[in-house]
Amino acid sequence: MIRGAPAPMAEPPPVIFCHDSPKRVLVSVIRTTPATPPCSSVGEPEPPPPLVPTSPGFSDFMVYPWRWGENAHNVTLSPGAAGGVVSAGLPAATELPTLRGAPPSSASVAAVSGGEDEEEASSPDSGHLKDGIRRGRPRADTVRDLINEGEHSSSRIRCNICNRVFPREKSLQAHKRTHTGERPYLCDYPDCGKAFVQSGQLKTHQRLHTGEKPFVCSENGCLSRFTHANRHCPKHPYARLKREEPTDTLSKHQSTDNKAAAEWLAKYWEMREQRTPTLKGKLVQKADQEQQDPLEYLQSDEEDDEKSGAQRRLQEQRERLHGALALIELANLTGAPLRQ
């Protein structure tokens, strides 16, 4: 055979030739116009194949899932999308098929983790009530928006320092202490001296002195007890906590060598006994507030008066309605002489 002469084309070329790999064959099948690589003569080195074979509408990292990680830098994210929305050139990371034993790409991991963060940020457990009022401590990145919203709000429950508005007067009073640094609720346990912004924080803190653990794991047979309602059982992390009143053996007969501490404990349980009928009546009417929303329990001084808040909102709506009716009546009176 003469060097440089073209190969005879007497027979159609086979499907696999010139040491083609299965990967190259797959791309050749996808191509709309298959390209037949030329056979080289004896002794002449085979020209290297193109690094990334392409075809109309497809790219190499889409055809071969095991190369997604190599092309992660080619994936672009839409600006402003918190979860990482993948551009039109690549399907969403959660929709991409996975191969057994193939590690996930950095793009898919970023998209999935971003989606989880969004879901956690917008979850219903973040503190929404049936009446539509948000409860609990707001997220740090929303405080500035709340302040800007309060500057244009007609609510009378407004902080005179930062212009934030609140749905309840007690929430406003607790918020003002963040500006003044006031901590009016002092723990009187011997040698403690800690002070708190809300009374709910003081009550929760005093359980450390009394040894109370009123919250128990709801899993059958589990004896784990907790001081706070926002804890999770290490053995059953998905089980809810339920409240049980402390028994005599757990708390009331707690022994201590300190005489002052013993007197404080005796006084504490005496006051608890006096408040017991009132507390039981409240527990029958509604579930424990701290277990429903621990963050709001720590922020509020006492149990919020939902009825008075609803009446106040209703009164504001009536005032707006009366104002609108007065404007309509005034417009009718001024327009009557013109029509005559």
From Swiss-Prot:
Gene3D superfamilies to which the protein is assigned, alphabetical: Classic Zinc Finger
GO molecular function, one term: zinc ion binding
Low complexity biased stretches: 101-114
GO cellular component: nucleoplasm; nucleus
Biased composition (Basic and acidic residues): 127-140, 307-317
InterPro entries: Znf_C2H2_sf, Znf_C2H2_type
GO biological process: regulation of transcription by RNA polymerase II
Sites bearing Phosphoserine, chain numbering: S300
Entry keyword annotation includes Transcription: yes
Keyword list, A-Z: Activator, Coiled coil, DNA-binding, Metal-binding, Nucleus, Phosphoprotein, Repeat, Transcription, Transcription regulation, Zinc, Zinc-finger
Region (Disordered): 96-140, 280-317
Pfam families: zf-C2H2 (PF00096), zf-C2H2_6 (PF13912)
Subcellular location: Nucleus
Zinc finger region(s), C2H2-type: 157-179, 185-209
Coiled-coil regions listed: 299-332
Function of the protein: Transcriptional activator. May be involved in transcriptional activation of erythroid genes.
Similarity-based family: Belongs to the krueppel C2H2-type zinc-finger protein family.
Name of protein: Zinc finger protein 367
Species assigned in the record: Rattus norvegicus
Gene field: Znf367
